[in-house]
């Protein structure tokens, strides 16, 4: 009877501890407008645009999540830009942040 009690206690403690943990998931930030400087669409500067603020916004996201987040932001015109080329701008933002769009991903 002791092994059953020990097993039941072990399983109960495992269930208790594993239900208390949570998975980390990234979220698409609203402050994506900081990426406008990367595209040189808001602040036209010579040289390299500041990429750190933009890339830090999508840092915790997987490549697919980052691409979807930036695509959604570009389509929603959060950047406040009327004429944008979605595939090119998305590619520029992902490349600057050392990210890749998943194969077959289309921002349309």
Swiss-Prot record:
Places the protein is found: Secreted
Classification via Pfam families: Hydrophob_seed (PF14547)
Protein name listed in UniProt: Putative lipid-binding protein AIR1B
Gene Ontology, cellular component aspect: extracellular region
Gene source species: Arabidopsis thaliana
PANTHER family in alphabetical order: PTHR31731
Disulphide linkage map: 28-55, 35-54, 71-107
Chain's gene name: AIR1B
Keyword Flavoprotein: no
